[in-house]
């Protein structure tokens, strides 16, 4: 993924802001995360790509990025974290290790969903002031060759909140607007400051849903925080996220044809987890 961006940059391809993206290769994922942190602090919209052990090396900087309300997106092709042996295939053991960093987590199940919903992560990060892990299954999704409908840059530009972009840049380190960062706090005030960010996470599901609705309007899709597939009065429901959802949907079609009442709740926004949205979808279709 990063290699494609590098090729586009070398070819002079412009982004929605009319700029050629600068690509920097660091010595390791730890260095990449530090560079992302510094770049964001200087007011540059920044993203990175990683997976598995590489993502784990980024965790210390992820805590800082999230706590400083720096809107970025880490695109992660989720892969197994190697233990007694190397395993390069897709599970979620890497992204699950990042649940408490403060990053929001958005998941896609196939190549078309990655194309459609990746902008939602970027747009919601800017408006919501919360960084995102945008993840999909390694190899099963990240290396699948598939024909997809791609975004028109003008459509993306229309959805981008330029006021949020300006606010982010004004928040950057600048000698004309001196501010203190990286201070030391004792326990009496540290906890209060840490909890002060809760309101952003409480508001974030609505922000994500807003941009999903904008995507739906432009593409004719039906993306929600949680999507349901199956019988309207299901007696058995599977809750899943990632590429397995496509397989489950085919299985549900087969079982519905046999008269079985089954369904699937597809999780898209995993963090922050909206209990209200989850309960609304589940109880609408699940027969007690």
Question: Which role fits each region the language model picked out?
Answer:
Residues 232-260, 273-278:
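Redox- and metal-dependent alpha/beta enzyme cores, enriched for Fe-S-associated oxidoreductases
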Residues 85-88, 207-223, 240-248, 267-274:
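A general structural motif
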Residues 4-8, 63-65, 122-124, 149-152, ...:
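Short, solvent-exposed amphipathic alpha-helical segments in soluble enzyme
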Residues 17, 132-227:
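Conformationally flexible catalytic loops at phosphate/diphosphate-handling active centers
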Residues 284-285:
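Conserved small/polar residues in nucleotide/adenosyl-binding loops
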Residues 1-97, 102, 119, 139:
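Thiamine diphosphate
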Residues 79-80, 136-143, 242-244:
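Glycine-rich beta-alpha junction loops
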Residues 88-138, 162:
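Conserved thiamine diphosphate
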């Amino acid at each position: 993924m990063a290699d494609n961006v590098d090729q586009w940059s070398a070819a002079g391809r412009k982004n929605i802001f009319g700029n050629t993206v600068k690509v920097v290769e660091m010595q390791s994922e730890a260095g990449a995360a530090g560079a992302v942190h510094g770049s964001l602090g200087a007011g540059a919209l920044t993203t990175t790509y990683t997976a598995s052990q590489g993502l784990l090396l980024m965790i210390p900087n992820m805590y800082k990025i999230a706590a400083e309300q720096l809107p970025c997106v880490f695109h992660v092709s989720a892969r197994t974290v190697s233990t007694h042996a190397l395993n390069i295939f897709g599970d979620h053991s890497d992204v699950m290790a990042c649940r408490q960093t403060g990053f929001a987590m958005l998941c896609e199940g196939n190549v078309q969903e990655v194309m459609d919903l990746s902008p939602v992560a970027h747009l919601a990060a800017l408006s919501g002031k919360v960084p995102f892990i945008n993840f999909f299954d390694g190899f099963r999704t990240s290396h699948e060759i598939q024909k997809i409908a791609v975004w028109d840059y003008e459509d993306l530009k229309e959805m981008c909140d330029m006021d949020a972009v300006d606010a982010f840049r004004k928040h950057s380190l600048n000698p004309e607007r001196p501010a203190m960062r990286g201070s030391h706090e004792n326990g009496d005030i540290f906890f209060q400051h840490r909890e002060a960010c809760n309101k952003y996470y409480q508001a974030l599901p609505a922000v994500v849903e807003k941009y999903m609705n904008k995507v739906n309007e432009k593409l004719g899709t039906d993306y929600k925080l949680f999507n349901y597939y199956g019988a309207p009065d299901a007696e058995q429901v599977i809750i899943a996220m990632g590429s397995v959802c496509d397989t489950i949907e085919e299985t549900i079609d087969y079982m519905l044809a046999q008269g079985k009442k089954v369904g699937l709740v597809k999780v898209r926004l995993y963090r922050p987890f909206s209990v209200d949205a989850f309960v609304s979808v589940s109880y609408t279709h699940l027969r007690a």
